[in-house]
Amino acid sequence: MSFSFLEETALQYWAQLDCPTSLKLTILARAGAWAEVLTAKVAPEDFIDPEAFARANASVTFLKKNPFIPGFTDEDRGSACRTSWREGEASCYKANERLSPYIMHPLEDSMPAEFLRRARKILLGWLGPCPTDVDDGSLSYDVRPPLQGASLRRDERRRRTLADYARHGPGTTFSSSVANPTAADKYDDVLSLTRGSRFYLWNLTDSIWMRSLMARAARMSVDPLDCLNWSRGNRFTTVPKTAKTDRGIAIECTLNIYFQLAIGRAIRTGLRRNTGWDLDNAAAVHREVARKASVLGHYATIDLSNASDSLCTNLVRILLRGTPWLERMEDLRSTHTFMDGKWHRLEKFSSMGNGYTFELETCVFASLIAALLELDGRSALLGHDFFVFGDDIIVPTDTAESVVKALAWAGFRTNPEKTFLQGSFRESCGGDFFLGYPVRGFYLKQDLCYGTQAIYS
């Protein structure tokens, strides 16, 4: 049997690792069973030696995210991704039904209702005031204390507006006319937006962007609103994830994502100011806590499966009910997704691709965990007693099972392959540790070519 350069490289890599797992994969590969190679797994609990596990883990991870190996086709990956998306919507529907009584009767005297009220109180305390639409002259809560003897000018102390936080993201948008648009491309493109976000055009008043839009309308002799690309929602697409499945994301409208990112930055600011938990540096903290936990066993690491597609609308509405935060998020979210030629009404609150999804899900997970810990009579300081960074969660080991059950009740499933409640292995934010030793495997995600092809292909 002949092998490609990529396949030969994998065979040589496994030979160098020289362990039972790499031998098994070599036998499967030589037999042409690449699908079994790509889905092979190792369990940390089957090992007692960090080096032995590191070699076995490196064997199975090497090709796990490489789409150029035979075994699964592009159609297989796309189909698996769409199936996962539909499963997420079905899960959100069930969670919405389960939580709907707590929207209609928020003061209900029951343990679940008390749990949600406690989580809501905690979350609102973390977020603080929502940015205003325009500069209303009020003083800011988002300033660092001045140096001794210094004072802040009035314009330095004003409350930050949505426009102050807003920015373009690195990805494409619903109306982008080029494959990898820059910020300049997005300013020059036709502005796309949903009906709910139209009021946020006011935040662009007197900006270069708005003047450009007005100039375009004048050149075309049409109403400025006729120069806009109105959309019902976002558009579904996929990006590479593993050799077996793609990752589903949503491409948002230009105006929506511009201010969604503003909400996301404002949430980060609120968390940092009110809790000290800085999402800009939290991943490194997670890795260090996971490393120590793999030795001491005092913390468990939890990873949620399909987390972004599992955040149902009713949960967010319960936690943020009656606040400007919810009003702005509702305005800027997409209520529908265009996929496979038709529009789908969303049961989830926001998709991966929405500019505030990461920050929102971090806060939702953290507030639910904090409420659970407080109701159990424990301390619940984010960044001290427990840690949350997106769907990467670290909690005290003796509370882990309760946390998993509470999150499941709220509509979230743990990923059993990446959740470790006991044993000598912990994983969080890209850090894998066995008894304190880093054991994360290498992922080869690109194709390899012979000779000069590697330079020019």
Where are these regions (language model features)?
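Core nucleotidyl-transferase/polymerase catalytic module
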Residues: 1-5, 13, 212-457
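Non-catalytic, polymerase-adjacent accessory regions of viral genome-replication enzymes
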Residues: 1-237
